[in-house]
């Protein structure tokens, strides 16, 4: 059972990042009035405190309707439980988040 205790100890000190707050992006007005739906994928760096920085738009479909801009703006408000290794928060680069824009049916 000594092995079990050791692994539980490690588990408590190490944890991966998990989203704890996902903001609702602002639906682009022109897309909304035309009934357009789409999505955008944003890449962020999760900070040691669980915030995000440097959001970059990677993909937007369909293009030109403002989904990308709205997603990047929303991404700045994402909150995560940060990745923790040996009890220390780690910065995590290259994390992707997909925002979907769907009309309420």
Regions found by a protein language model. Give the residues of each.
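Acidic, low-complexity proline/glycine/alanine-rich linker and hinge segments
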Residues: 1-33, 69, 73-79, 105
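Residues at secondary-structure transition points
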Residues: 8-9, 41-44, 93
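A short, well-structured alpha-helical segment
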Residues: 17, 36-41, 47-84
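Generic alpha-helical hydrophobic packing signal
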Residues: 17-23, 55, 92, 96-98
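Cysteine/selenocysteine-centered motifs that mediate thiol-based redox chemistry or coordinate metal-sulfur cofactors
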Residues: 82-104
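Hydrophobic residues positioned within well-ordered beta-strands of beta-sheet architectures
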Residues: 1, 40-42, 95-99
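A generic structural micro-feature
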Residues: 32-36, 72, 89-93
